[in-house]
């Protein structure tokens, strides 16, 4: 059973035959595993929380500063991703660029060690964190495009799912190691304590080392194919070329452009599930701080395993069906959590963990969808547009979450309306689902050159 398809589209970069065995695929997926500490430890659970603590000023001041920094870095990613991706395509140096960006990400992560718990270090922390976010996103563009070197149309779903699942598992493993070895004990490994926040700062050094070491297998299996580099072009000309490529893609494979729009919507909803899950856990379902961390750990394990399993279905059912199944399930479970919000912790543990099982599969299937249809030689550029479209609408989930809470609180005069934010996230997911339904899977022609 496969997705309903449109007439044949442009030649895809994927080759007809698999590009090596599972050892090669594992090497590729180690980038997901190795780079994940930046997302899990630095931007979500540890450093961002540290940076918004009272050590750096009032909570309102630090939280606002972090929000502004995040917005600026997101805007820069939206502007730079397609152009830098196009540059990788034109130069044929996508793997080289990925290697340099990964090393820079490791250095920026380790440099967070120098952010001491004093107000004067807030700007340094924001600059390093923002720069790391930009580098991480741009590196992901080149990494996603490199899937053509290890996958074929027959296994791209399970390869993408395996990589995404490795990211979940690697991120949560390093988080747990750091928590139990350095952060939780009064005196941790090597005598590390919380004096001067040295436990947090040493954790940043470990993250940098983790990124550097565990991504090495990726660069052992990926190679830049010999290619005559295209002529150098200026910044303005680069954006003109991106626009010309988008128009050409619109003419050749219009439903791929539709998919970029649909995925931008539902990917923002998927991000909202994890972004506001911890907020709801503590505020509505009254989980303690320790319970939230435990829930986050279990949720990432569930998401990682589920993503790998759904990758197998991707190659059988097609990526669009996997995404549809995931989105329908997420909306339904979200509505159930809303209705049963008075049920306490058991409701959140049961339905919340079930919900996380469908987030990763939708993300991984989105990557495999594009990998199947991207025209040959345009992987970096199209995955750059994929990053850009996601950034353009990244305000929707936070806005919908907050708007539902604010309106209901205003109408009812009650303060305990946080759970209404669940409907905001469900609405964004449902909007992405509605836009995705009419999208057809372009039947791209398979490339014939060796990978």
Specify the residue positions occupied by each region the protein language model found:
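Juxtamembrane intracellular "pre-TM" segments in multi-pass secondary transporters
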Residues: 9-26, 223-261
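Short amphipathic helix-loop junctions that connect adjacent transmembrane helices
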Residues: 42-63, 275-292
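A membrane-interface helix-boundary motif in multi-pass transporters
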Residues: 59-61, 182-209, 403-429
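Helix-to-loop junctions at the C-terminal end of transmembrane segments
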Residues: 79-93, 306-319, 405
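Cytoplasmic membrane-interface "Motif A"-like loop-to-helix N-cap segments
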Residues: 88-103, 315-329
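C-terminal ends and interior cores of transmembrane alpha-helices
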Residues: 102-119, 328-342
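Multi-pass alpha-helical transporter architecture, strongest
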Residues: 210-221, 423-451
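C-terminal transmembrane helical hairpin of 12-TM major facilitator-type secondary transporters
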Residues: 320-364
